[in-house]
Amino acid sequence: MEMEMEFLRKLPTPQELKEQFPVSTEVVAVKAQRDEEIRNIFEGKDDRLILVIGPCSADNEDAVIDYISRLRTVQEKVKDKIFIIPRIYTNKPRTIGVGYKGMLHQPDPEKKEDMLKGIIAIRELHTRAVKETGFTCADEMLYPENHRYLSDLLSYVAVGARSVEDQQHRLTASGVGIPVGMKNPTGGDISVMMNSMIAAQHGHTFLYRGWEVTTTGNPYAHAILRGYVDKFGRNIPNYHYEDLQNLLEHYEDVNASQQTTLANPAVIVDTNHS
């Protein structure tokens, strides 16, 4: 038997969905402005800190908009020190593969999975976020082939601890035009994360959504430190001075190797998994 897989229906391409659910010129302008500010922070031209903040997953559109609308007030109070990127995570990696997988799979948690409604729902949610709050947001790049459904709306993506060793994630990250945070894996090996950043900062030729594509590399690929569980089942934190010093030494080792360099060295500490 060739495939144990039932093909249910062909979904619209990202281009088709963008034509069906276009963004306004105002949304385009907001994203361009925020993307520039974020680049300036990563390049060291702006000394503000980036704060990616929000719930574990987005499962209710109105609740998400209410939450990030409140962040707008917070942003005004801290705008000289902190640049807020709301976290709207619309797909969830599952440790054992079962359970609620996020709005992309199941736009209504009380109903059955529907991927067509899901891709529409996540696009409408991110569009509404920009229009109503002025925030472009962050999402997890759980499925690299789906990134272009939201590529005109997002200002930040993360590659999770379970995905960071995957080649397609690394190569796709090399071609997105926004910062990509690479997490250390669940076992805590910093070198895996560093290798992922090196791959993402270099150009590649590969297959993507039925095309042969080429990329120039993403100079804003960077580290996300998360806590982990060691081989003895102990929870190891990620936020101590020693952890940051260790990461700095890894950056320095890479840039001293003469084989490659990492542009715009940066770190975000994942306090959800500290």
PLM regions: where:
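Conserved, mostly hydrophobic/aromatic
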Residues: G54, V269
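Active-site-facing alpha/beta catalytic cores
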Residues: E2, I68, K81-H250, S257, ...
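Glycine-rich phosphate/diphosphate-binding loops that line cofactor/substrate pockets in enzymes
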Residues: R39-D47, A256-N264
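Active-site/ligand-binding-proximal alpha/beta "capping" segment
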Residues: L247, A263-V267
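Hydrophobic "anchor" residues on beta-strands that sit immediately upstream
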Residues: I50, F83, A266
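N- or domain-start disorder-to-order transition segments that initiate the globular core
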Residues: M1-K45
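Short, glycine-rich nucleotide/cofactor-binding loops
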Residues: P55-D62
